[in-house]
């Protein structure tokens, strides 16, 4: 009887907190985000300039982008805007089906790191299925409450012709020259776009949805309503993709680095499993300092975000998690999950997509960043992994101020260095004892999220 009364109190408490958080995060302070005209902007490996083409800007201005192609340089703000809006935005939601073994129907106030982890994986899947150059054809139709930001000191008014996809943006999916073929490719890419979003839906059967991640988190001692750090979320995403049964997801896997070390042979084994070459998402949990972020690491972070292989960073500032996607000068560009939106039923044909795309980026100073974060990369095959390892090694060795790089690549398997790499799992226990200890250690090191 007493236990029943305690359960009722806990349910009442969670309902009160849910109502409070739903109200709190349904209101957003509208602050304008400004970008400088004279500095390049980097977004997940692409470089943009907010200048007119006759302004004398050259590709040398983007020399630290890590890319050999001058085509990455753009003089059009709208191209940057379209690219940014096309990234999948996953935020707090309310009124979704109740999470198993809990009374939660919202993740407001506790699920922000799960959301930023989802966004990073979603970007990896977009690149995997549609290519980095893909953009959503309706991106420029998204209403931006900060419309002044797009025009102040930077851009002309939107040209209606820009709302149509350029040939460059459609190159990955538009393989034929016939209008019918182009139309079919366009429909195919939009179907994939919707399918990727549906994998992150807020209902129990979604492979990478909140319900599934919380379910997997139980094996590491987490429950709905707990906070999750970037490293813990990395392992949950890895488990989620291992558990997925969709045939289209069998061609991609996730590797989580151990103690800031990527073991090349382990990555190759994942990519060439059973003779079938797979793409790999590499997640590297790191710390950028002790209690505070060491400013000397910023050059590393900028170099990483400039690479074409980068799919973002799960990080944030103390008590808040953000998805970092780029930078300008000393400011990071990010997507913010701290906005409560209503549940969307993705089982409905042509469900609305607008709430899954962020209309405007935000910026913050690097010095405000919490030192705990997870860096993400995507490699389509073993050859791309070799290239990524080469480029990243250059970036990680570029600073002479730090004696130790952010992370390293090591030849061989983790087990060669007395680490557990590819454990045999008990079908009833998703995490090995070694992993549980590591996750517990990560949990005590990472920042508390509200």
Curated annotation (Swiss-Prot):
It is found in: Cytoplasm. Disulfide bonds: none annotated. This is Cysteine protease ATG4C. Cysteine protease that plays a key role in autophagy by mediating both proteolytic activation and delipidation of ATG8 family proteins. The protease activity is required for proteolytic activation of ATG8 family proteins: cleaves the C-terminal amino acid of ATG8 proteins to reveal a C-terminal glycine. Exposure of the glycine at the C-terminus is essential for ATG8 proteins conjugation to phosphatidylethanolamine (PE) and insertion to membranes, which is necessary for autophagy. In addition to the protease activity, also mediates delipidation of ATG8 family proteins. GO terms for cellular component: cytoplasm. Its EC number is 3.4.22.-. The keyword Ion transport does not apply. One of its GO terms (molecular function) is cysteine-type peptidase activity. One of its GO terms (biological process) is piecemeal microautophagy of the nucleus. Pfam families: Peptidase_C54.
